[in-house]
Amino acid sequence: MDAAHFEKTLTSEVLFEGRVVTLTKDTALLENGKTATREVVHHHGGACIVPYFEDGTLCMVRQFRYAMQQELWELPAGKLEKGEDPFEAAKRELEEECGLTADHYTPLGEFYPTVGYDTEVIYMWAATGLHKTQMHLDADEFLTPDRVPLDKAYEMVMSGEIRD
C-alpha cells in the first residue's frame, strides 16, 4: 500500500542520549510544504510473552513502575538490547521474570505502543507447554510472578486493574 501522507526529516538534533532512549528534536517537511518540529524518543524496542498454562491461567507479573509511581500487573516483557533478536529476548524474559521455559512459541505480531513520539516496537509471542525453571531477575529488578486465570485477567483489564 502506498502512503498517501508523509513527513520528511530535514534535520535531527540529539538532545539526550541515555542507556534506554535517545531524544531528538527534528525538523520535518510536511506534505503542504511547511515545516514542523518533532520531538522523537528513539527506543530499541521490546519483547513481550503471553505464558499460557494448560489449566487456562497466565503467568503475569506485579512490578513497581517508577514513571507511573505505582505497582502494575503486566505480561512478562523487557527491552531489547541494540541488535538483539526479539524472539530470543522474549524467551529470556519468560525465564527471567516467570522462571519458565516453553515447548511452543506462537508469534502474535508486533505493535507500536506510543506512535505519536516514540519509535518503540513491541514484538509478542504466546508460550505454551510451560516448564518451571529458575527466575533470573536483573540486580535492579523487583517483581512478583503470579498465575491469573484468563477470564480473571480479562475482567482486570475491563475494570482498569490491568492498565499496561
Regions found by a protein language model. Name each.
Residues 46-70, 74:
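A glycine-rich, hydrophobic loop/mini-helix early in the fold
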Residues 11-48, 54:
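Acidic, metal-coordinating catalytic segment for phosphate/diphosphate chemistry
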Residues 40-41, 64, 113:
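Residue-level structural signal for beta-strand termini and adjacent loop
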Residues 2-13:
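A short, amphipathic edge element
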Residues 36, 45-48, 53, 79-164:
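Unchanged
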Residues 23-25, 37, 61, 75, ...:
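Hydrophobic residues on conserved beta-strands that form the core of alpha/beta folds
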Residues 18, 67, 114-117:
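Short glycine/serine/proline-enriched coil/turn segments at secondary-structure junctions
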